[in-house]
Amino acid sequence: MEKLRLLSLRYQEYVTRHPAATAQLETAVRGLSYLLAGRFSDSHELSELVYSASNLLVLLNDGILRKELRKKLPVSLSQQKLLTWLSVLECVEVFMEMGAAKVWGEVGRWLVIALIQLAKAVLRMLLLIWFKAGIQTSPPIVPLDRETQAQPLDGDHNPGSQEPSYVGKRSHRVVRTLQNSPSLHSRYWGAPQQREIRQKQQQEELSTPPTPLGLQETIAESLYIARPLLHLLSLGLWGQRSWTPWLLSGVVDMTSLSLLSDRKNLTRRERLELRRRTILLLYYLLRSPFYDRFSEAKILFLLQLLTDHIPGVGLVARPLMDYLPSWQKIYFYSWG
């Protein structure tokens, strides 16, 4: 136990001292997941495991950096724990589905899917009703912007002070003097004022409390939270080939969005979340049974047409054509 504690402390020290190298490690792990996909049998499961690990690594490192920078989430400790558990579930849900299907078959797969969706719904309802978290965004915890937030870790740069710079007489460009440039790993490749404005905007956005929801908005958010459970229940009643689950889920999503149509008083992050949900309605084109009966043939034909007539497109289109059928069958990819 003592060795594990020392190893943990050393890792935390490394992350706080080398945020740029940590970000490169996260990117390398995520890139490895893409390289593994389709290389051998069981490669999809291994690829998803590595991808889930990369997301958990980002979540862990962000927590370490926030603690070092004293940039705690603007929520209570209990709410922060719920958000963390919700984030962990979203990181591992696809791998858990694929692993359950591999080990326990279809029955185990659907059982794991139902348990994960139930756990996520309970956590989100607690956040909505008990903690008054408002419109819940995805991801639940905003990733830390390493480029701007990691600046205070550099001892030779103080973002709170005015940074000496030179203004060109003809071009009027603002150029940082070499003497006052931060070290390479924490340098921001933009005008000094741009970095300060960006930091201020992000800090204000993170510290802004969620918009209080009225009865109509609370019902809308509750519908959005309950939609996965309603869809799973309808699948159990009518089966995967029936149109009823697809139509019911679509009606619930559109009703939720229509009840949240008044966006004037929402924060920027909440408006972006509603825009994301609106765009995700396009996923219904890729969800069964609509995909099986209408979309699949047309999408594959279009990709093949682009591959045959536009040079270079095949490098992206062919792997996409190979992977799309597998992707569409994974519940948390298409319905999660």
Swiss-Prot record:
Topological domain spans for side Cytoplasmic: 1-84, 132-336
Peroxisomal membrane side: 106-110
UniProt-annotated location(s): Peroxisome membrane
InterPro entries xrefs: Pex16
Gene Ontology BP, a term: ER-dependent peroxisome localization
Pfam family, one: Pex16
One Gene Ontology cellular component: peroxisomal membrane
Keyword field contains Transmembrane helix: yes
Record field: transmembrane: 85-105, 111-131
Region (Interaction with PEX19): 221-336
Keywords (A to Z) from UniProt: Membrane, Peroxisome, Peroxisome biogenesis, Transmembrane, Transmembrane helix
Required for peroxisomal location: region residues: 66-81
Membrane topology note: Multi-pass membrane protein
Main location: membrane
Quaternary organization: Interacts with PEX19.
Reported function: Required for peroxisome membrane biogenesis. May play a role in early stages of peroxisome assembly. Can recruit other peroxisomal proteins, such as PEX3 and PMP34, to de novo peroxisomes derived from the endoplasmic reticulum (ER). May function as receptor for PEX3.
Family classification: Belongs to the peroxin-16 family.
Stated name of the protein: Peroxisomal membrane protein PEX16
Organism: Mus musculus
